[in-house]
Amino acid sequence: MKILVLASSSQRRIELLRKLGADFIVIPPRITERIYDDPAKTVLENAFSKANYALVYAPENSIIIGMDTVIFSHELGVIGKPTTIEEATHILKLLRGKWHSVYTGVYIIEKNNLKYKSFIEETRVKMRNFSDEELTLYISSLEPLMKAGGYAIQGLGALLIETIVGDYYNVVGIPITKLYITLKKYFGVDLLREAVRKRVVGKTRTI
């Protein structure tokens, strides 16, 4: 039986995969994330590094998934994760009332034969022209810290968003649909079938 390995320390990604009913183990990658001028290159190289770090420690029959997400705007270029309130405030002020892109790179590798697939998903997001008071309140929650682009769309950051074009879950950090299709087509892992099977078995046991 194939074992899914998530090469991530992101609680958002871990929680989202668990909500789908997927069985997987987590190997937090100890890498230095790199940022280049090109957002596509940034996320793919970081996803590659995460997956290959976990590959060393993953059990046999593993399929390892590495992912990386960044924000890109024409004013700021590639935006990573702010580590200070000042940095988060600066980023959100420049994103306010404007469109930006969320890029997620995914790198999947099978340990037994080193077969791999990679892809990039882009989602377009427009922020509201929120007030300075709203910005201050949001910053005070500390939610923006260590979040790509300085906001968490699955949290209070949703209140800052006006429009999304593309995969919502890509903004959270996992392009769910494309990941599901890729795992099923190239690696023989059917997340939907497995999730349904677990639910049916669970209901049978409670009867």
Curated annotation (Swiss-Prot):
Similarity field: Belongs to the Maf family. YhdE subfamily.
Location of this chain's protein in the cell: Cytoplasm
Site, as annotated: Important for substrate specificity: R12, T69, Q154
Record keywords, A-Z: Cytoplasm, Hydrolase, Nucleotide metabolism
Top EC group: hydrolase
Catalysed reactions listed for this entry: dTTP + H2O = dTMP + diphosphate + H(+); UTP + H2O = UMP + diphosphate + H(+)
Gene Ontology BP term (one): nucleotide metabolic process
Role description: Nucleoside triphosphate pyrophosphatase that hydrolyzes dTTP and UTP. May have a dual role in cell division arrest and in preventing the incorporation of modified nucleotides into cellular nucleic acids.
Protein name (Swiss-Prot/TrEMBL): dTTP/UTP pyrophosphatase
Keyword Hydrolase included in the entry's annotation: yes
Pfam family, one: Maf
One Gene Ontology cellular component annotation held by this UniProt entry: cytoplasm
Cofactor (UniProt): a divalent metal cation
GO molecular function terms attached to this record: dTTP diphosphatase activity; UTP diphosphatase activity
Listed InterPro entries: ITPase-like_fam, Maf-like
The enzyme's E.C. designation: 3.6.1.9
Active site: D68
Endpoints of the signal sequence: none
